[in-house]
Amino acid sequence: EQIGGSLQTFIRGGEKFDTGVHYIGGLDQGQNLYSYFNYLGIMDKLKIQKMDLNGFDQICFKDDDRFYPIGMGYDNFKKQLTSIFPDEKEAIENYCIQIQEICRYFPLYNVEQNDYDFDVKLLSINTKEHIESLTSNERLRGVLAGNNILYEGYTNKSPFYVHALILNSYIQSSYKIVGGGDTIGKLLVRKIKQLGGDVFRKKNVVSLETSNKRINHAITADAEIFYGQNFISNIHPKQTFKLIKDSLLRPAFINRINNLENTVSVFVINAILKPNTIPYTNQNYYYFDSYDVWSGPIYETSQWPT
């Protein structure tokens, strides 16, 4: 019934829960997501709540009583961490410089054109290895990568540019959507309809038909046909390939994608707390058994339920 994929919410016990969009970054005026939402005509209609400036994320470890704050704004980010790691000032400074530098190579991310010559070597920099090259301090390594669940951080696979693009937005500014992430989807649907567009729900696309080396139309399970010039699929690439009867892609590319290993999902518990039992904090908490924050995805069925 709902639209929006991970923007969807659900209600239990009279309380609304987000499924995917719990908080978002880059919403201060002039920042990337603000620019996109403003262009789409929904920014002024979104109700947003800015998170804790001095620690919108708190990284926590077993047997360590300290909470490690991820501060908002790069100066504040450095201030919060150098107060805990005074001997690591240079590493923290370099981390911030390198994150911002990598983000400059992605014009769509920055909503601008640039003259940077893209270096493909950037795509091969490993997040874990790069953070380890910045500092030998185990705690600081764990803190800098402590919210890697945001991009399903994987020891030998997660590239640093992905880490940079995501963390940069949150460090710039972090917000919660008042009323739930589905508000974004509802506002977009309203805007599309205002501009004369149509939004269809519960339409199961079973085939993408081609003509002249382009996708020409989509066919749904109830035999409706939708013609168009551009088709965007946000389902799993493997499933998208199955919909294209006459493949427009090289077999070698399809085989490579089909042979890629899927990442591990997460087990999520949503809880309604008893009123007036736990004080509200305008922060997120990431908890780990050790300073090794990369072991989560390395999981075997035999380990359940640890």
Features from the language model and the residues they span:
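N-terminal glycine-rich phosphate/pyrophosphate-binding loop and immediately adjacent elements
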Residues: 1-94
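Ligand-binding pocket scaffold of soluble enzyme catalytic domains
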Residues: 144, 149, 157, 189, ...
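Helical element adjacent to the flavin cofactor pocket in flavoenzyme catalytic cores
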Residues: 164-221, 229
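Glycine- and acidic
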Residues: 18, 113, 146, 168-176, ...
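Glycine-rich phosphate/pyrophosphate-binding beta-alpha loops
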Residues: 21-26, 148-153, 266-268
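Rossmann-like flavin
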Residues: 62-158
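Mid-domain catalytic core of redox enzymes
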Residues: 176, 206-306
